[in-house]
Amino acid sequence: MAKEYSRTQRIGDQMQRELAQLIRREIKDPRVGLVTITAVDVSRDVGHAKIFMTVMGQDNAEDIAQTIKVLNAAAGFLRMQLAREMKLRSVPQLHFHYDESVVRGAHLSALIERAVAQDSQHQEGPASPDAKPESTEE
């Protein structure tokens, strides 16, 4: 049985694809780096859309904030371009947000790797796992 997607999910998926291409092709501002649109969350009334994005090579919070500011300033232009590409009665207002899930995921992976390394060090300690316990019987 095929998965059922709501209308807002379908609109969000199409907006994600279109915005990725539009930003790459149309936004020539040097403050905007390599932007990846990770998700688009469209409201039920299709009036607003939260666009979650990451920027490759920009770990500095100021650079990321500047990129978001530029994209939010260009939201009207991007919305107009989306209206040309998509067959919608009204195109939602665009609100760009930084997607911190990628950074959080990398941090959690580092914590897990550190915990596994510490665990393996404790197991390799004074007693090896292959050693048999000594018998007290004579």
From Swiss-Prot:
Keywords: Cytoplasm, Ribosome biogenesis. It is found in: Cytoplasm. GO terms for biological process: maturation of SSU-rRNA. It comes from the Bacteria. InterPro entries: KH_dom-like_a/b, RbfA, RbfA_dom_sf, Ribosome-bd_factorA_CS. Pfam families: RBFA (PF02033). GO terms for cellular component: cytosol. SUPFAM superfamilies: Ribosome-binding factor A, RbfA (SSF89919). One of its GO terms (molecular function) is ribosomal small subunit binding. The keyword Cytoplasm applies. PROSITE patterns: RBFA. Residues 116-138 are annotated as: Disordered. Its main location: cytoplasm. One of several proteins that assist in the late maturation steps of the functional core of the 30S ribosomal subunit. Associates with free 30S ribosomal subunits (but not with 30S subunits that are part of 70S ribosomes or polysomes). Required for efficient processing of 16S rRNA. May interact with the 5'-terminal helix region of 16S rRNA. Belongs to the RbfA family. Monomer. Binds 30S ribosomal subunits, but not 50S ribosomal subunits or 70S ribosomes. This is Ribosome-binding factor A. It comes from Pseudomonas syringae pv. tomato (strain ATCC BAA-871 / DC3000). The lineage of its organism: Bacteria, Pseudomonadati, Pseudomonadota, Gammaproteobacteria, Pseudomonadales.
